């Protein structure tokens, strides 16, 4: 990555960031991928960011774990092109952002695709507020996504133009306490159709016009929470726990589009130990995750007749930072 400090633009301090990794994929794996690419104008009490960086739902509170999923699907995980404005007054920070989709995409009738937000012509909207005082951070946010799943439908070999839209709101609260030796962080998300942030969910078909094939939709709601506790300076033991519950839909549905819509609940626990010295981080981490799979209850979008499947994962990491 490259961080650049530029000359002042009026009264604003200017900076920019470009960061790449080798986690991209296409015709092959381990190809170059753009992580961050943005410029920032900082007036002291306010700042304007233009470009691609972390989705505001990821925000300033994320677990410190070795696994590359960074706590997903309990923690929203996405980098998105955006226009973000922040205003600070005392210990209060207010954030507003309009976002598009690039690498992390919403699910729909054709799987993951950018066309749902492209056809919608409405960006994702986020608004949040944070209280920051010394090592304590407490905040909350609300996010709106509005998608157009389809623009045409076929009924009896006839093609009809349809006007479809699924709009949903998601809410989150978060906290972080950081001292010389302690880090305690937690977040809870009541999410609706947040598949573009690596979370489970989606939406279901609640009605179909028999003449044109136009569909109406009901978003799937999920409750996800996690907590992360880290202690130490050189040797750092840490634990992470996450829980997700499928809350179903507000309406009866006939079919679902999304990720993990056949999962009723998800539980994960992680224990790790890292050794930290200047420029180096060595660590080992064990994770146990259990998912309860089942079948769709069409009356409320919930998952019933479940059975659990567990997965064990061991991660060993060596990081050289410069």
Residue ranges and their predicted role:
Residues 134-263, 267:
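Detector for outer-membrane/organellar transmembrane beta-barrel domains
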Residues 23-25, 55-59, 101-104, 145-149, ...:
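Structural signature of outer-membrane beta-barrel domains
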Residues 1-104, 121-137, 176-190:
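Outer membrane beta-barrel
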Residues 23, 66-71, 106-115, 152-162, ...:
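Extracellular loop and loop/strand-boundary signature of outer-membrane beta-barrel proteins
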Residues 30, 62, 106-108, 152, ...:
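Outer-membrane beta-barrel and related beta-rich outer-membrane complex signature
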Residues 277, 308-322:
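Outer-membrane beta-barrel "beta-signal"
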Residues 34-37, 79-83, 123-127, 169-173, ...:
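Hydrophobic, lipid-facing positions within transmembrane beta-strands of outer-membrane proteins
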Residues 29-31, 75-77, 119-122, 163-167, ...:
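Short sequence motifs at beta-strands and strand-loop junctions characteristic
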């Amino acid at each position: 990555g490259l961080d650049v400090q530029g000359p002042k633009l009026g009264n604003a301090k200017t900076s920019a960031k470009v960061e790449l990794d080798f986690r991209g994929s296409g015709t092959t794996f381990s190809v170059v991928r753009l992580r961050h690419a943005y410029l920032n104008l900082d007036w002291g009490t306010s700042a304007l960011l233009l470009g691609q960086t972390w989705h505001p739902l990821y925000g300033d509170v994320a677990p410190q774990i070795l696994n590359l999923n960074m706590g997903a699907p309990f923690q929203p995980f996405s980098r998105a092109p955006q226009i973000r404005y922040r205003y600070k007054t005392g210990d209060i920070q207010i954030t507003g952002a309009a976002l598009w989709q690039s690498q992390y995409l919403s699910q729909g009738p054709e799987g993951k695709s950018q066309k749902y937000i492209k056809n919608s012509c409405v960006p994702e909207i986020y608004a949040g507020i944070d209280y920051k005082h010394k090592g304590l951070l407490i905040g909350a946010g609300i996010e709106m996504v509005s998608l157009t799943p389809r623009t045409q439908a076929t009924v009896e070999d006839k093609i009809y133009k349809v006007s479809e839209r699924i709009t949903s709101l998601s809410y989150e609260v978060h906290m972080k306490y950081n001292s010389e030796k302690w880090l305690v962080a937690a977040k809870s998300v009541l999410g609706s159709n947040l598949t573009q942030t690596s979370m489970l969910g989606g939406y279901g078909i609640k009605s179909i016009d028999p003449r044109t094939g136009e569909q109406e939709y009901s978003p799937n709601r999920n409750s996800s929470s996690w907590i992360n506790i880290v202690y130490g300076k050189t040797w750092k033991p840490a634990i992470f726990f996450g829980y997700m519950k499928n809350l179903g839909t507000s309406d009866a549905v006939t079919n679902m589009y999304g990720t993990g819509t056949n999962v009723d609940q998800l539980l994960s626990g992680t224990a790790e130990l890292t050794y930290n010295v200047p420029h180096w981080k060595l660590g080992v981490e064990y994770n146990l995750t259990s998912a309860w799979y089942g079948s769709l209850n069409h009356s409320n979008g919930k998952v019933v007749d479940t059975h659990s499947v567990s997965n064990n994962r061991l991660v060993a990491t060596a990081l050289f930072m410069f």
